[in-house]
C-alpha cells in the first residue's frame, strides 16, 4: 500500500501520478474520510484526557461520599463516550485501510507513459533468430508428433488449459527447473526455499493480488473458517517469509528462489491463448525474490533482471528486454522489465519473465522492516520479484527454436550432459 503521507499531504500530486497507471483516485472520498478521521482522532484524544482526569479525581475523592457518587457517574459516562468514539474511529480507519488497499503503486518517473503494450520501450535484443529452410511447426504440433504433450487426457480429467507431459518432454521440463535453480543458487547467490502452495488470503493481500485480482485465483473453501487459495506465483510465499519481521541491516539483501507450480483461473484473459503451453491454469515457474534497502532497489532490479536473462542466454534463446509503460506496469510495481522470447512459428516475441521493483508497497502491507544501525530506527524494506523463468513457456520456446528439418528437437548444450541424461535430441 502507499505511504499514508502521500494521501494526506500530497493528494492531488499522487492522484495525477496514479492517473498514469489508469487509476482515477476518488479525491473527494479520501479527503472526506481523512477530514472525518482527523476530527474523530482529536475527539477521541480529548475524551481520553477527560476520562483520565475524572478517573484521577474519583480516586482522590473516594472518601467523600456525595462527591464520589457524582464523580462515579461521570467516570462511567466518560468511559462510554470514549469507547463509542474509539469504535467509530476504528471503523473509519478500517474503511480507509480497505480503500487504500485498492490503490495501486505509483510508477517510477523513468517509466514511459502509455496505456497499452504498444507504448512499452525496447531496451535491448539478444541472440540471432534462426533461419529455417523447411516449414516449421509450433510447439503444439511438435508435442503431438512425439506423443509427449497430451491435451486430450488432461481435458478428460481436468478440462481445458491443462496439459500432461510425458517421456523426454517431461524430462526436459524437469531439467529446466533444475538448471534454473542451480544457476540462481550456485552462481547468483539465491537461497532455495520449498514453500506452501496453499496460503491464506492475508498472504495475497500482502503481495497485492488481493483484493483486486480475486477472480483470477483458485479458492478452496473447506469450511467457513478453513479457507485457502492456491498460489498464482512463488512471489507470494517467498515475499511473505519476511512478514512482520524487523531485519538487521547487515542481513540485507535477502535473495530467495523457489520452484513452484502456479495456479491461475485466467478469468481476465478469457479466449486468449486457449491452446498450447502459453496460458495454462497450472504451470511451473522458478521465482526470484529480493528484499533490499530502499536506496538499493533500482540497482537490485537491474541485477535480478540480468539473472533471469542469463537463463535465456545459456539456453541460447533469442529474446528482447522491454521496459513496460505506466499502463502496463502491474498493480504493485513501480517499474517492470519483461523478457520476451522468440517464437518462430508465430514470428513474435512472448513474455517468459516479468521482473519488478515493488518499492515499499508490499513491505507496508506485510510490515517488513529493517533496523538501521546508525539511527537505531526501523524502516520499510523494498521488495523485488521476477520469473527466472516460466518453465512451460521456456520449454515451448526450446521446442520451436531447436527443431530440425528431420523432425528431431535438439537439446540445448547446457542441459545435455548434466540434466538430460546425456540426450542430445528428442526423436
Curated annotation (Swiss-Prot):
Its EC number is 6.1.1.11. SUPFAM superfamilies: Class II aaRS and biotin synthetases, tRNA-binding arm. Pfam families: Seryl_tRNA_N (PF02403), tRNA-synt_2b (PF00587). Pathway: Aminoacyl-tRNA biosynthesis; selenocysteinyl-tRNA(Sec) biosynthesis; L-seryl-tRNA(Sec) from L-serine and tRNA(Sec): step 1/1. Homodimer. The tRNA molecule binds across the dimer. Catalyzes the attachment of serine to tRNA(Ser). Is also able to aminoacylate tRNA(Sec) with serine, to form the misacylated tRNA L-seryl-tRNA(Sec), which will be further converted into selenocysteinyl-tRNA(Sec). It comes from the Bacteria. One of its GO terms (molecular function) is serine-tRNA ligase activity. GO terms for biological process: selenocysteine biosynthetic process; seryl-tRNA aminoacylation. This is Serine--tRNA ligase. It comes from Buchnera aphidicola subsp. Acyrthosiphon pisum (strain APS) (Acyrthosiphon pisum symbiotic bacterium). Keywords: Aminoacyl-tRNA synthetase, ATP-binding, Cytoplasm, Ligase, Nucleotide-binding, Protein biosynthesis. It catalyses: tRNA(Ser) + L-serine + ATP = L-seryl-tRNA(Ser) + AMP + diphosphate + H(+); tRNA(Sec) + L-serine + ATP = L-seryl-tRNA(Sec) + AMP + diphosphate + H(+). The keyword Cytoplasm applies. InterPro entries: aa-tRNA-synt_IIb, aa-tRNA-synth_II, aa-tRNA-synth_II/BPL/LPL, Ser-tRNA-ligase_type_1, Ser-tRNA-synth_1_N, SerRS_1_N_sf, SerRS_core, tRNA-bd_arm. Consists of two distinct domains, a catalytic core and a N-terminal extension that is involved in tRNA binding. It is found in: Cytoplasm. Belongs to the class-II aminoacyl-tRNA synthetase family. Type-1 seryl-tRNA synthetase subfamily. The gene is serS. ATP binds at residues 264-266, 351-354. CDD domains: SerRS_core. GO terms for cellular component: cytoplasm. It is an enzyme of class 6 (ligase).
Amino acid at each position: 500500500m502507499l505511504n499514508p503521507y502521500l494521501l494526506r499531504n500530497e493528494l492531488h500530486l499522487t492522484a495525477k501520478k496514479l492517473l498514469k497507471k489508469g487509476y482515477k483516485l476518488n479525491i473527494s472520498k479520501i479527503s472526506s474520510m481523512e477530514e472525518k478521521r482527523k476530527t474523530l482522532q482529536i475527539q477521541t484524544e480529548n475524551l481520553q484526557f477527560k476520562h483520565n482526569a475524572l478517573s484521577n479525581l474519583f480516586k482522590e475523592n473516594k472518601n467523600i461520599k456525595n462527591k464520589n457518587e457524582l464523580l462515579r457517574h461521570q467516570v462511567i459516562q466518560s468511559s462510554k463516550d470514549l469507547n463509542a468514539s474509539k469504535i467509530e474511529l476504528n471503523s473509519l480507519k478500517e474503511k480507509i485501510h480497505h480503500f487504500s488497499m485498492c490503490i495501486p503503486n505509483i510508477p517510477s518517473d523513468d517509466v514511459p507513459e502509455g496505456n497499452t503494450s504498444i507504448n512499452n520501450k525496447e531496451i535491448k535484443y539478444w541472440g540471432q533468430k534462426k533461419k529455417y529452410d523447411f516449414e516449421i511447426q509450433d510447439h503444439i504440433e511438435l508435442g503431438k508428433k512425439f506423443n509427449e504433450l497430451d491435451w486430450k487426457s488432461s481435458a478428460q480429467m481436468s478440462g481445458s488449459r491443462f496439459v500432461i507431459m510425458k517421456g523426454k518432454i517431461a524430462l526436459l521440463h524437469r531439467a529446466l527447473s533444475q538448471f534454473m535453480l542451480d544457476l540462481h543458487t550456485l552462481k547468483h547467490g539465491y537461497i532455495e526455499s520449498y514453500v506452501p502452495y496453499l496460503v491464506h488470503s492475508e498472504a495475497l493481500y500482502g503481495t497485492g493480488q488481493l483484493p483486486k485480482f480475486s477472480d483470477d485465483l483458485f479458492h478452496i473453501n473447506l469450511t467457513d473458517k478453513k479457507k485457502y487459495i492456491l498460489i498464482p506465483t512463488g512471489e507470494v510465499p517467498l515475499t511473505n517469509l519476511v512478514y512482520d519481521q524487523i531485519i538487521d541491516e547487515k542481513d540485507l539483501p535477502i535473495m530467495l528462489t523457489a520452484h513452484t507450480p502456479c495456479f491461475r483461473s485466467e478469468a481476465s484473459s478469457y479466449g486468449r491463448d486457449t491452446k498450447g503451453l502459453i496460458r495454462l491454469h497450472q504451470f511451473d515457474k522458478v521465482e526470484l525474490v529480493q528484499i533490499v534497502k530502499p536506496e538499493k532497489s533500482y540497482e537490485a532490479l537491474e541485477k535480478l533482471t540480468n539473472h533471469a536473462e542469463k537463463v535465456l542466454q545459456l539456453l541460447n534463446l533469442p529474446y528482447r528486454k522491454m521496459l513496460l509503460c505506466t499502463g502496463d506496469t502491474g498493480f504493485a510495481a513501480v517499474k517492470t522489465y519483461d523478457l520476451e522470447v522468440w517464437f518462430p512459428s508465430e514470428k513474435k516475441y512472448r513474455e517468459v519473465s516479468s521482473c519488478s521493483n515493488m518499492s515499499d508497497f508490499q513491505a507496508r502491507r506485510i510490515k517488513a522492516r529493517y533496523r538501521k544501525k546508525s539511527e537505531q530506527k526501523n524502516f520499510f524494506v523494498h521488495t523485488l520479484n521476477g520469473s527466472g523463468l516460466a518453465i512451460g513457456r521456456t520449454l515451448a520456446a526450446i521446442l520451436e527454436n531447436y527443431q530440425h528439418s528431420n523432425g528431431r528437437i535438439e537439446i540445448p548444450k547446457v542441459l545435455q550432459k548434466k540434466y538430460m541424461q546425456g540426450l542430445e535430441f528428442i526423436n
